Amino acid sequence: MNRLPFGYIKLRLAGRKANPMTNLIHHWSGGSMNFTWESLVLIVAGVILLRISGRKSIAQMTSTQTVVMISIGTIIVQPIIEYSLFKTLIAAAIFTSTLIVMEWIQMKSNTIEKMLTGKAKIVIENGQLHIENLKKMRLTADQLEMQLRLHGVTAIQDVKIATLEANGQLGIELTDDAKPLTVRDLKKLIHPDFINKDGQAQSGNQNIFDEVGKKNKKNVPKKLH
C-alpha cells in the first residue's frame, strides 16, 4: 500500500472543520476573548472566591492568609495578559480550597496552628516592656507606643498586660485604676450588698489574657481548641 506524503496529511487535517467542543475548550484555555467580558468574569470570580475564603480585612489577616490572598489576586489578573481564564479559575479555586483546609486543620491541632499562624506574645506586663519579645517580633518601642495611642492609652504604666496577636493587632488589659468606670462599678457604689454577690461571680470569670501566659483553655470547646 502506498503511503501518503506527510505534507498531504497536514493539508487534509488543516482543511477539516473543527469540532465545536474543541473550539470551546480552546476558547476557555487560551483563545482570544473579549476584554470587557473577561474582566467582568474575573471580578465576579474573585469576589466569590474571597467571599468563600473569609471576610477578614487585610489588617486582621495572618501571614498565611495574606500570602494566599495576594496570590489569588495575582493569579486572577494573569488572564488579562496571558488569556487563559479556565486555568486561572482552577488555580484560584485551588488556592482558596487550600486556605480552607489549612484553617480546618488549625482548628483540629494546636501544634499546627502555632506553626502556621503563631501565638500571642506578651509585650507589656505590669507596666514593664518585654524587651526580648519585642526583639523577636521585630517591634520597636515607637511602633508599640503608636499602637497604644490608637487604643487611647497615654502611659505604659497604665497597662497591666499587652499582647501582640498573631494577626498583628495589639490586645490590652488596663490596670484597675486605669480602667473606665462600668455599670458594675456603679452598682457596687450604689448597692453595698452587690459587692459580695459580684465578688463571687467575678472570681469565677476567666481572664482571656491568662491564656497567653498560663495556656489555660478550660472554657474553650475541644473542637475550637
Swiss-Prot record:
Ranges for region Disordered: 197-225
Keywords, A to Z, come to: Cell membrane, Membrane, Transmembrane, Transmembrane helix
Presence of the UniProt keyword Transmembrane helix in the record? yes
Show the ranges annotated as biased composition (Basic residues). Answer: 215-225
User: Where does the record place Polar residues bias?
Assistant: 199-208
Q: Which family does it belong to?
A: Belongs to the UPF0702 family.
Origin species: Bacillus subtilis (strain 168)
Q: Where are the transmembrane segments?
A: 30-50, 66-86, 87-107
Q: Which domain of life is it from?
A: Bacteria
- Gene giving rise to this polypeptide: ydfR
Q: Which GO cellular component terms, listed alphabetically, does the Swiss-Prot or TrEMBL entry include?
A: plasma membrane
> Where is it located?
Cell membrane
Kindly give the InterPro entries that the UniProt entry links to this protein: DUF421 (IPR007353), UPF0702_alpha/beta_dom_sf (IPR023090)
Query: What is the topology of this protein in the membrane according to its UniProt annotation?
Result: Multi-pass membrane protein
Query: What is the protein's given name?
Result: UPF0702 transmembrane protein YdfR
